[in-house]
A protein has these predicted regions:
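Short acidic-hydrophobic catalytic motif
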Residues: 1-71, 76-151
Length: 151
């Protein structure tokens, strides 16, 4: 993979980090397509497959249009399950992802795959609370401050 990548999926505040550049994630699935030679971001889209069946259909079309060999970073935020279609799951499978989140409300998904890869070959994590996958050495460490008390 020509880029340092960190994908963190959380219920509120998921992020994709590509060579130190943070890309925010809105509710649903976010996909970031990379240039296979340079690792530069070619495009990124968000699909709210929790609320809109049309976004599942749009996700499937988006993935179908990608060229073979394109690296794709996937993150979820909040929920992706309620309107996720079989076609969208199959499209994600064409990136090497194995997990099917239909019927798994509020489960989080983080993955790094390649268009045309065999199902189950992507780097992938699924968890109820937070899911993270990393390739390479992230250039910046993110510190999350959960509380601060001044006296």
């Amino acid at each position: 993979m020509p880029a340092d990548l960190t994908v963190t999926s959380k219920h509120d505040g998921s992020t994709i980090q590509v060579n130190g550049r943070r890309i925010g994630v809105a509710k649903g699935y976010a996909l970031v397509v990379l240039d296979p030679e340079t690792g530069d971001v070619r495009s990124h889209e968000t699909f709210n497959t929790s609320w809109y069946r049309e976004d599942s259909e749009r996700l499937a079309r988006f993935i179908a249009a990608l060229p073979g060999g394109a690296p794709v970073v996937v993150a979820s935020e909040f929920d992706v399950s309620r309107m996720l279609t079989a076609e969208a799951v199959a499209a994600l499978g064409s990136l090497g992802l194995a997990e099917d989140l239909r019927g798994r409300f509020n489960v989080l998904h983080a993955a790094i795959g390649v268009k045309g890869a065999a199902r189950g070959t992507a780097l992938e994590a699924v968890h109820q609370d937070a899911a993270t996958v990393t390739i390479g050495a992230p250039q910046f460490r993110i510190v999350e401050l959960n509380g601060l008390e001044l006296r």
